[in-house]
């Protein structure tokens, strides 16, 4: 008996996308395609995501990073979610660029706690050359410890990506934050194209790209799908895709927004895994607010990278020991 074949010619765009979502990945993901993934029954979506995950990764392995804020607060941008913006009245205290030895001490502690990558974040719109020089020294010294290095420093000017590459930088983080259609609701001091231009400069130097977004900022499901479409359809999708859950900080414009349903966040992780099968999908900011059960569902949905211990820029993050206990419960091991 022949397997039944669905004739999709008479279906509308969304119906066709739903059928295709159950079958095979398109060469280029449309927003409709990704919305159709979101709309699958939860068990079907999880099965699809886990199947894709197992085809490309050790299903029980998770890459572990530690993120250190090497320069905090005082940023001139107006990102509506960010407590480091100088224009917002938050509890974040401005701190100048850390000294090299302070950073190296944090990197040693991260390595001892099982991290394989050390990420350095600075609250700049764009680094000045005089500020970049000490960061280059940090990258070289952390790299010499045997850790992978990552930096998030804001927009890069011509020539700066080359300097980062020469210093040995492995990853550069620069998020798109949200879909182009919703971007103006989040930030006005930097354009979407500015972000894409920085990513192009990073790619030109063959530095791995870490690029994702923030979920739960009031965007629609279609706009969440739009963010994933932007990422998945890049000429080379990001090697690392951080999916952040908005951490609401009093004093920022996005404080007091309706909280995202946890299962919608899990669906976002699953859709990211399906659309970017060879990328590491990082369960990033907001994890400290998640019940262990939701974190477990995120791992099942294809998340295979986390930030471990320390502080995630200016928001809390579960301590390393709590993470180890969760890994033990789930049979997960660090990569």
Swiss-Prot record:
Residues engaged in binding [2Fe-2S] cluster: 119, 150, 210, 282
Pfam family, one: Radical_SAM
UniProt keywords, alphabetically: 2Fe-2S, 4Fe-4S, Biotin biosynthesis, Iron, Iron-sulfur, Metal-binding, S-adenosyl-L-methionine, Transferase
Named cofactor requirement(s): [4Fe-4S] cluster; [2Fe-2S] cluster
Binding site for [4Fe-4S] cluster: 75, 79, 82
Catalytic activity entry: (4R,5S)-dethiobiotin + (sulfur carrier)-SH + 2 reduced [2Fe-2S]-[ferredoxin] + 2 S-adenosyl-L-methionine = (sulfur carrier)-H + biotin + 2 5'-deoxyadenosine + 2 L-methionine + 2 oxidized [2Fe-2S]-[ferredoxin]
GO MF annotation terms: 2 iron, 2 sulfur cluster binding; 4 iron, 4 sulfur cluster binding; biotin synthase activity; iron ion binding
Cofactor note: Binds 1 [4Fe-4S] cluster. The cluster is coordinated with 3 cysteines and an exchangeable S-adenosyl-L-methionine. Binds 1 [2Fe-2S] cluster. The cluster is coordinated with 3 cysteines and 1 arginine.
GO biological process: biotin biosynthetic process
Enzyme class: transferase
InterPro entries per UniProt: Aldolase_TIM, BATS_dom, Biotin_synth/BioAB, Biotin_synthase, Elp3/MiaA/NifB-like_rSAM, rSAM
EC number, as in UniProt: 2.8.1.6
Domain Radical SAM core: 60-284
Pathway: Cofactor biosynthesis; biotin biosynthesis; biotin from 7,8-diaminononanoate: step 2/2
Job of this protein: Catalyzes the conversion of dethiobiotin (DTB) to biotin by the insertion of a sulfur atom into dethiobiotin via a radical-based mechanism.
Self-association state and partner proteins as the record states: Homodimer.
Family statement drawn from the similarity comment of this UniProt entry: Belongs to the radical SAM superfamily. Biotin synthase family.
Protein name (database record): Biotin synthase
Originating species: Methylobacillus flagellatus (strain ATCC 51484 / DSM 6875 / VKM B-1610 / KT)
Gene: bioB
């Amino acid at each position: 008996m022949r397997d039944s074949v669905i004739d999709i010619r008479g279906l509308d765009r969304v119906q066709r996308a739903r059928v295709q979502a159950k079958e095979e990945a398109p060469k280029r993901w449309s927003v409709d395609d990704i919305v159709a993934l979101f709309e699958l029954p939860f068990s079907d979506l999880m099965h699809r995501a886990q199947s894709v995950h197992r085809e490309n990764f050790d299903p029980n392995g998770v890459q572990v990073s530690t993120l250190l804020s090497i320069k905090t607060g005082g940023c001139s941008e107006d990102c509506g979610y960010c407590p480091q913006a100088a224009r917002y009245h938050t509890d974040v205290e401005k701190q100048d660029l850390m000294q090299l030895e302070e950073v190296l001490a944090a990197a040693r502690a991260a390595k001892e706690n099982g991290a394989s990558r050390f990420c350095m974040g600075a609250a700049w719109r764009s680094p000045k050359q005089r500020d970049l020089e000490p960061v280059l020294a940090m990258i070289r010294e952390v790299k010499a410890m045997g850790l992978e290095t990552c930096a998030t420093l804001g927009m890069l000017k011509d020539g700066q990506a080359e300097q980062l590459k020469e210093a040995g930088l492995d990853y550069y983080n620069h998020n798109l934050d949200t879909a182009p259609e919703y971007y103006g609701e989040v930030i006005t001091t930097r354009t979407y194209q500015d972000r894409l231009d920085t990513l192009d400069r990073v790619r030109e130097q063959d530095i791995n790209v870490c690029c994702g977004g923030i979920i739960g900022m009031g965007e629609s499901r279609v706009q969440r799908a739009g963010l994933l479409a932007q990422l998945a359809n890049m000429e080379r999708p990001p090697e690392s895709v951080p999916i952040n859950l908005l951490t609401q900080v009093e004093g920022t414009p996005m404080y007091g927004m309706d909280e995202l349903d946890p299962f919608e966040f899990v669906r976002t992780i699953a859709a990211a895994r399906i659309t970017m099968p060879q990328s590491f999908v990082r369960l990033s900011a907001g994890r400290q607010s998640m019940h262990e059960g939701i974190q477990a569902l995120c791992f099942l949905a294809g998340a295979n990278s986390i930030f471990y211990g320390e502080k995630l820029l200016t928001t809390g993050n579960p301590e390393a020991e709590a993470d180890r206990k969760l890994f033990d419960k789930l049979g997960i091991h660090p990569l």
